[in-house]
Amino acid sequence: NEITTEDENSNKTSDESSDKSQDENNNTGDDNKNNNSLNIQDRNCRIFFFDSNALKLKYIDTTIQVEDGAIIKALTNELQNTNHNDDFLTLTKKVSIKSATIDMSTDVLEVVFSDDYTKYMTLGTATESGLLSSLICTYAYNLGVNKVSIYFGDELYTCLRGDLPEGYFNVDYSFAEEYVKEGIDKNT
């Protein structure tokens, strides 16, 4: 009843909700010395970021490279990327994904981080909540689920809520705004 989307040993199974129109990327060998065993695909996705100046959730539609079906790892790497906008709060690079699974009986995506990212970041109430929103919205949107649980090792992360009786966060990204770089008119 579970689909494993990734694990720490890099033995991943395909995610049933993955986009079937993905194109395989031609790897030239510059990216990885062991490129013969990698399956790298380009995937269109939506990344949600918290704008720490405007205190709003924004999103960017982009294409990312996914190695061996590790979509959560690839999405997390993009959430650690500061290239989009200096005002976007990005996840520290001091943590990584240990595993990610979807429980098909409950439709809950469980994401396990290597460590507590809040230990490595200076976060206030709004920014901690905003960072959590960017994580769960990015994961949920791209995997087609609406419930996400975050773990630091085997400890359930509850953010500022103190307790999560259901064991997961319900995801709502309907209030997010599309990010448009200044000087770019999307209507042309």
Give names to the regions the model predicted.
Residues 1-188:
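Bimodal "functional hotspot" detector
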